[in-house]
Amino acid sequence: MKSMIEARPGIFSLYRGMRLTVVAVGLLSLPLLAAAQDLTQLYGEHGVSPLAVRQGILGTCFFHASIAEVAKVAPDALKGDILPNPGGGYRVHFSQGPEEIVFPEDVEYGRIHSYDRSEGTWVLVLMRGYAQRVLRLSLVKAINQSTLIPFFVKPLALSWLDQSGPLLVAYDRAIRSVVKQDGELDKAGLKLKLGDELNLIGIPAEQAKELAGFLDEKGFFDAVALTVRQNGEVFGAYKTLGQGQIPVRVIEAFMGNADAGLVSDRKGVLEQLRRLHAGGVALVAGTKLSVPDPAFETENKSWWVPTHAYSVLDYDEAAATVTLRNPWGGRPGPDGIFTLPLAVFYQGYEGYSDSR
């Protein structure tokens, strides 16, 4: 899944420090709002809507295109998924499982590092909550499947993971601080940083030691590492391989049931496009890595980005056209929205994910 950096090399100069210096030129001069925006403002001019969603410098098109779709289909429900947390910050509600806590400092971190450029902070709050959710699911699975973690220790770990609380915040922060640009993790570095973060959020030292020690158990660290590799961008990895970041998981997290298919299945994709037009369905489509016709990229350069996720906004069966939106909020300008003949959609797109 493409970030703006990968698609247009030379536009951005990156520095992996506490702050990120960005130089923008040309048609894609998209202002980063980290410094100017009030971090206490959840919603901007467009509220919870696709037009408010704008991807940051990471390759999170799979997340931003999906959130834009959910915002189109169920804006009130998505707005209701962000709740105030009594201890500060927010709680993010999902279709299943515990709520995730997102603190103001984690929202600020995301803005400083340009994880997101959306209006307000609601998309970034959902993004941090989603990152914690995918971690939680992988950790629960790893603990349940482990034959080496002592039976008397498992209940402690599962009890922490079965409730909304700061444990996943600590994991999220620790991973963000040590993840490499390709999504890889160093076990020793993660264990050390996780211990620090667990202590900082107030988990007793003995329990913090046990929880960090799980990373030494066979299969446990592997589960964490795989989750980060598959969802590396939401943890701050600038250049992952695009493996596993599928929109169906994001749609599923916020809307319940979701499925995926291939655009080459003409009958299947037409059925979903008709459902989309009828209303109530979220649909995200991903472009191919390449197309056999060399002229295609030239003829469609105003919007074409390979292996990139787009929100599908509408389908006009009479005109045989599909309307989509680039989560960059541009290309094409001014808002990333464009309409394609159905034949061009078939030629340029590989797969889709939809709510059920």
Model-predicted regions and their roles:
Residues 37-356:
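Accessory/interaction modules and long regulatory regions
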Residues 19-31:
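Bacterial N-terminal signal peptides
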Residues 4-22:
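Bacterial N-terminal signal peptides that target proteins for export
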Residues 12, 26-29, 70:
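Alpha-helical transmembrane segments and their juxtamembrane interfaces
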Residues 32-36:
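Sec/Tat signal peptide C-region and signal peptidase I cleavage site
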